[in-house]
Swiss-Prot record:
Task performed by this protein: DNA polymerase involved in damage-induced mutagenesis and translesion synthesis (TLS). It is not the major replicative DNA polymerase.
Record field: catalytic activity: DNA(n) + a 2'-deoxyribonucleoside 5'-triphosphate = DNA(n+1) + diphosphate
Name of protein: Error-prone DNA polymerase
A cellular component annotation (GO) from this entry: cytoplasm
SMART domains associated with the record: POLIIIAc (SM00481)
Gene: dnaE2
Membership in a protein family: Belongs to the DNA polymerase type-C family. DnaE2 subfamily.
Amino acid sequence: MSFVHLHVHSPFSFLDGASRLDDLIAEAALHGMPALALTDHNNVSGAVRFQRKAQEAGIQPIQGAELTLEGGYHLTLLATGPKGYANLNRLITAAHLGQEPRATPGAMFALAPGHDRLQPACPLSALSHDTDGLIALSGCRRGEIPSLILRGRLAEAEAAARRYAAWFPGRFYLELHDERLPGEQALNRALRDLGEALGLPLVVTSNVHHRTREEFFVHDLLTCVRTLTRIDQPHPERPLNDQRYLKPPEVMIERFREFPEAVKNTLAIAERCRPVLDLDARLHPEFQTPDGSHPAAYLTHLVYDGAARRYGRITERIRRRLEHELTIITRLGYEDYFLLVWDVVRFARERGIRCAGRGSAADSAVAYCLFITDVDAIERGLLFERFMSLERAQKPDIDIDFDARRRDEVAAYVYRKYGADHVASVCTYNTFQARSAVRDLGKAMGFQEADLDYLAKRIPWHAGADEILTVMARYPELRQSGIPWHKFEQLVQAAERVARFPRFIGTHLGGLVISRRPLLEVTPLQMAAKGQVVCQFDKEYVEDLGLVKLDLLSLRTFTAVDDAVRAIGDIDYEQIPHGDAATYEMLGVGESIGVFQLESPAQRALQARLKPDRFEDIVASVAIIRPGPIKGNMVEPFLARRHGKEEVTYLHPKLKPILEKTYGVVLFQEQVIEIATAVAGFTPGEADQLRRVMTHARNREDMEAIGRLFRQKAAAAGVDPAVADTIFSYIQGYASYGFCEAHAAAFANTAYKTAYLVRHYPAEYFAALMSAQPMGYYPINTLAVEARRRGVGLLPVDINRSEEAFTVEEWSREAWEAFWGMEPFAPEYPATGKAIRIGLRAVKGVGEPAAAAILAARDGGEFRSLADLVRRTGGAVPRGPLEALVLAGAFDRLHSNRRAALWQVAHLLEAERIRQERGAGQAGLLDGDAPGLGAQAAEALEAASPQGTPAIADFGAAERYLKEYELTGLMVRTHFMRFVRERLAREGYLTAQEVRQRRAGELVKVAGLPVCPHRPPTRSGKIVVFLSLEDETGLIDLTIFEDVYQRYGHLIFTDPRPPLAALGRVDRRGGHVSITVNRLRLLDT
């Protein structure tokens, strides 16, 4: 006799399941169990993987969930098929919303009034209907019936059992457990008696939370994390023993020998169930064409209409390409998908929302003619099969970047068009990585939070929870940190056990899922923190379910571009010419800070060596500075051949037209496809399969099989076998490093145009870029330093001149020096006559409401004083924002003593409160002419008046400076390094600007603030650290090789990062200047 576990939790129970899903399935298969259920708490996130892996193991998957009901009771539910699964989704959704979902087209699902979205609770009324296809088990000790029995309320338990039996006629079982808990045997016998009295069947489960008894500690620890308790503290939800494991059938049979029918019923229930998911479904929404025509016909009409607008004259070459693509699209049945994406982009463009398609979709001429992408695939000779092919028959994936500020408008349009019951955000699973595991598990284990914080901050952010020992051995900042690793040994071991376990569900930044059928038939829905409706599957699983995923991504660069273009006024961004010599000249000296995709130190170094003078150079730049090409040693051959220092050769004449534009180097994935097509006669779809085998590092058998096929086909095409073998080895070496050319071209377009804005409109562009933070590679002060270097001033926040965001003003050095008594930073470029004014919201603590209230009041004229502002805003600006503005210097033109102004804030707000209480007639209260208001008012008035302000000494210059920097992230009036420059100059330290004039090999000393240290992968596998030092003249890049890094790594990767001083030799490569570091130390300040 066998047995089936019907109550099983995986890590998708979010901190209440301690064994990986694959391990649970393997354990069930090991013991010959015919089926296995998955019943995670209030979700089915593991359903797709569970069904796939169980079927692969020869086990029947039973999908269910443990539902939390109102009152906190638990109920185990199992779906017998797709209909039951849909009803299960409805009930889980009701639990997350606190009420039954009642979505109507154009309306969102809503939380019940007063319901906490983090505390699922399904109303009992939701169980009273539409439960077909669901089997219900009475649950664990937290089920309503067992809970009532344990409290001696037997009559109420019987009434509850009658209710459930009525809600699930012929499908309700009383659930027995044996977890060796007090009162358990009595409970089981009471349940048996109740079953006999009401004619209800029994079933046994093990309430599984971990695979083996040895994993109990992990389960207990995760429970402590979930309940915010320490392992030395009791909590009613903590397990008392290790009995919630996946017991072998013989153990279950032995333990329940008193209840043989209950054991048999596990098999009977399994026989009633079948897989609930159709993983071959096509749930794409049908696009309703405006003229009622077939979607394929309408798509063809739109494509040719767009082609006429793109090309003017549609040549035979264009027509053949479009027909080829349309044939593949329609044969695969994706015409509705293309129309859906076209419609979304059309909506955005009609409303002036900047957007652009990217990724392999730019390989499509159809996408270009639909204005989804701006890359001409025909002109560039891009292969559609890199995007879609009949052989691969995979769903197309079109990523679209939108202005970050307005992306939600586009998403709202999708909800309106397809209905709230057909659209939801894709979820993400926030998983345990090293830092989160250290913090969460360590706190539960009783470590001091300061110790955990110290440890977590020193672990690289990208390290997995099972890589802590690896990074400790590899990185000196961990080895030399003084961390007593023996103290954390058990914590590190626990972290390894929970690596990549999901902690909670999050919201995908841009993914929307759209379904032809109501989504509740496919997935439960729940509410995210910001009000979005989120499905319970991530981007991988929604595609497995046959749903359309629409990637509406937010790109802050577009926000900056849009602001800059509006500030400039007389520029057509779309028509910026690709041949501007001044832009290429700027890039050619490595001055690309602020340029999309080209601003990292590696890119700046590449630009200075590449000396780009054409758009194709930008496309190559985007593709080549990636971990793969760098590890594959593609950069040096490409540069040498680009500048004629190395001969360009081809293994076969057929390779020349393919590789000519990249100087014989396989740089793009599309080139691999073209080579296989030209040399071996592969169809484009077959060639893409070859690329995918190579790119994704498939197993040796796959590689050998595709290699044999390549050689056979090449020989049949007349290629010498030895040459064919060499070509295959050649592309095999490069294919895994290649980048998608279409994606590179799409990004290169934005890269070039933003470079044009940096070169010709630095004030407007950097102001917009600073307003759009956080984004890009550098902190905001680095952007400000670069703007100043380009002759653009930086003006402090001013209560009468600042707008909400950063803005551009006319400016002169003379006016600055006259007011501030110091000269601004010395620019390398001629002064532009313009300056960037810091916006109100750039000050930490000043949110949109406060800034809006200030600007609305200022419409009536400039503020005369702090008191005037408080009176005219009616006290709408709270104390926190006002004090932040004072400390940031926003009132300096009105109040020279910041400390005195700070004193007045609270008293002025109190006086304004009194004024409002006494009525609008007391308008003069803050001006001191409202007699007879009482002692409290008089006291407030006196304190708020200039006469009532005590004689307080103002902050010192250093204090003012540090507060400005703390609140804005900007060094406004001077740079920190200017405070120590005189001393450093005496000691022989150079500025970044001076280093750029020194000869290669010269030994120099530099100092500055460290910016963006990073350790990219290298071909050798050794660690090389790149970072920049920022001073008042700009950035100087440092290269730190492994031997030096091993000595000084503890100074680099710290939080916060202190100023550093470095000794090293000047390195000149092309036009790029950097320093190879010999010694590093903390800068004495």
